[in-house]
């Protein structure tokens, strides 16, 4: 059997791959079961394609190499020709691995007639046997991995451009009237945008419906947040709000010189969009009504839709933050009253929505509130104004520890652990059938350091049951080994 070579440094990898016509690199981790399974497939492929170079890198032990090749999860494969990356693969997909190796290295040494069409010419009998074994043993985990991979792909698509449109067809050839209308709006706004034709990929088409909780297409995103479909985009365009949203998020708008746009510019003032740019004034009655609304509640959110059913991603983000901070607030749906929608832009001198007010004073839109939330400034402002009681670190830790009967403080999330020890504890809890809450200590340094003192336990992960510390990774694994884990967490 041709050996898969373990690589211990970036220089060693570059030397091995640089001198080879074709090289495949497997980034793996000892704690990852999927890595072990894919490593067997990788080893069999090394036999079938003995004229190529096969290398292994333990991702966590070689951070310099992992960072150089953009590795954020395992198993991960990089395919190189003469030292240059030509393709990659993330996740446990033996069929894809076999096909990518075949494409990289050329025909295998096995007879093509022995290989099913589903794997192309990539795999020999040993690989096929391993694929079948993995399919039988890991059907459920493969489905989960596929869903995770799809969600990651969707997130990458949504964030690939500041403005991104999921549509039927292409901007040059829309395949439905609604998609055509949104493309026309974006062109009139003079904004550059990326797009994806959902007719070419049913996984993306169906996945986006769940991802966005929006059942139809087109779907327009700005800075990763859903603005809405055709009707909402057209309404925002006609009111001038779409342009305001782009400006608020520092998205450049290109001046358009077409005849159509000259005609738009020549329209009477009454037909122009963008209320803020007009020299209109509020009447005394309008101003009184708006001031009454912004002071209706101590914390007042002007959003599209309702807190239960936000009608745009930015409004949804704001509502989520307020709920996460446990801030009591009232709201007003600006889609139900255009006089309020346009008038509040003038009163606040703020061109877009949502808008958050505290004690009648404008705090800002979703981006500003998000930054304040991340930095802790939002809670500080609310505490200073007496809206929420100032929470001590100890109180916060107690609240977090008691937020679930079984609570795990870990690096990363249960779906994407960021260290081997955290991954082992997550796997142990899942195998024991224990439901648990989790907190990513990498997301909050104050919690990370505070919990060490509070629990008198210096490392992570830390597992709690009914607010009492059970222990770290070693203790959890001992309980699992002795069969006591589930009973300990259900007494």
Swiss-Prot record:
MF (Gene Ontology): 2 iron, 2 sulfur cluster binding; metal ion binding
Organism field: Oryza sativa subsp. japonica
Domain of life: Eukaryota
Keyword terms: 2Fe-2S, Cytoplasm, Iron, Iron-sulfur, Metal-binding, Redox-active center, Repeat
Pfam families associated with the record: Glutaredoxin, Thioredoxin
Transmembrane segments: none
Protein name: Monothiol glutaredoxin-S11
Record's GO cellular component terms: cytosol; nucleus
Family membership: Belongs to the glutaredoxin family. CGFS subfamily.
Chief location of this protein within or outside the cell: cytoplasm
GO biological process, one term: intracellular iron ion homeostasis
Summary of the function given for this chain in its UniProt record: May only reduce GSH-thiol disulfides, but not protein disulfides.
């Amino acid at each position: 059997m041709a050996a898969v070579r373990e690589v211990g440094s970036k220089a060693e990898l570059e030397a091995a791959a640089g001198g080879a016509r074709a090289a495949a690199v497997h980034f793996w981790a000892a704690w990852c079961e999927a890595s072990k399974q894919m490593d067997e497939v990788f080893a069999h492929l090394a036999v079938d394609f003995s004229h190529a170079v096969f290398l292994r890198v333990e991702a966590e032990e070689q951070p310099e190499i992992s960072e150089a090749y953009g590795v954020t999860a395992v198993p991960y494969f990089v395919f190189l020709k003469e030292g240059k990356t030509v393709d990659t693969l993330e996740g446990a997909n033996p069929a894809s691995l076999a096909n990518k190796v075949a494409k990289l290295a050329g025909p295998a040494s096995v007879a093509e007639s022995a290989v099913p069409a589903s794997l192309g010419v990539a795999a020999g009998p040993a690989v096929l046997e391993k694929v079948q074994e993995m399919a039988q043993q890991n059907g459920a985990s493969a489905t989960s991995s596929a869903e995770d991979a799809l969600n990651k792909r969707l997130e990458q698509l949504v964030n690939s451009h500041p403005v991104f449109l999921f549509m039927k067809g292409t901007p040059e050839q829309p395949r439905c009237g609604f998609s055509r209308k949104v493309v026309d709006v974006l062109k009139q706004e003079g904004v550059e945008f990326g797009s994806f034709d959902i007719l070419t990929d049913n996984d993306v088409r169906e996945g986006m419906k769940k991802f966005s909780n929006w059942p139809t297409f087109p779907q327009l995103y700005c800075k990763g947040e859903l603005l809405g479909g055709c009707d909402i985009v057209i309404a925002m365009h006609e009111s001038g709000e779409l342009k305001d949203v782009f400006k608020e998020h520092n998205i450049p708008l290109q001046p358009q010189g077409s005849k159509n746009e000259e005609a738009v510019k020549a329209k009477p003032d009454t037909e122009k969009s963008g209320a803020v740019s007009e020299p209109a004034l509020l009447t005394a009655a309008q101003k009184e009504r708006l001031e009454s609304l912004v002071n209706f509640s101590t914390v007042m959110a002007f959003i599209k839709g309702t807190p239960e059913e936000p009608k745009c991603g930015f409004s949804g983000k704001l509502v989520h933050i307020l709920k996460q901070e446990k801030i009591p607030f009232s709201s007003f749906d600006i889609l139900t009253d255009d006089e309020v929608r346009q008038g509040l832009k003038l009163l606040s001198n703020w061109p877009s929505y949502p808008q958050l007010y505290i004690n009648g004073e404008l705090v800002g839109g979703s981006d500003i509130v998000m930054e304040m939330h991340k930095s802790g400034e939002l809670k500080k402002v609310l505490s200073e104004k007496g809206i929420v009681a100032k929470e001590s670190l100890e109180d916060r830790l107690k609240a977090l520890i008691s937020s679930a009967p079984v609570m795990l403080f870990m690096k990363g999330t249960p779906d994407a652990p960021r260290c081997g020890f955290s991954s082992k504890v997550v796997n142990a809890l899942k195998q024991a059938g224990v439901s648990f809450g989790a907190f990513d200590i990498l997301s909050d340094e104050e919690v990370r350091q505070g919990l060490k003192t509070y629990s008198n336990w210096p490392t992570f992960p830390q597992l709690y049951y009914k607010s009492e510390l059970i222990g770290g990774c070693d203790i959890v694994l001992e309980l699992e080994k002795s069969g006591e884990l589930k009973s300990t967490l259900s007494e």
